[in-house]
Amino acid sequence: MPSEGTWVYVVNLRRVYWGRRTRRAIRAVRMVREFVRRHTKADEVVIDNELNNYIWSRSREKPPARVKIIVSIREEEPEEGGERIRKAVVRLAGRKLRPGRYKG
């Protein structure tokens, strides 16, 4: 489980193509969200609008086969007190980044 920081991941979305054709982009967004939640143990996952538009760019029937993402993890205090919330913000990565810890 990575602590607070920024990480680069490559998410394979080929499995989406096994499903029904009209639900592929919806399932791809859900798979990205579940992948980030599993790898970062985040309570809340926020997907950036640019990543969402990239997945939906080729219509709902033909999402990309894989996506390179940057995940920023931070812990936030709730306003009313209580436990800290672990939040992951997911955005689209550039092509030259290698998977692993991102320093930048």
UniProtKB/Swiss-Prot annotation:
InterPro entries: Ribosomal_eL31, Ribosomal_eL31_CS, Ribosomal_eL31_dom_sf. GO terms for biological process: cytoplasmic translation. GO terms for cellular component: cytosolic large ribosomal subunit. Transmembrane segments: none annotated. CDD domains: Ribosomal_L31e. Gene3D superfamilies: 3.10.440.10. Keywords: Ribonucleoprotein, Ribosomal protein. One of its GO terms (molecular function) is structural constituent of ribosome. Pfam families: Ribosomal_L31e (PF01198). Disulfide bonds: none annotated. Belongs to the eukaryotic ribosomal protein eL31 family. PANTHER family: 60S RIBOSOMAL PROTEIN L31. This is Large ribosomal subunit protein eL31. It comes from Aeropyrum pernix (strain ATCC 700893 / DSM 11879 / JCM 9820 / NBRC 100138 / K1).
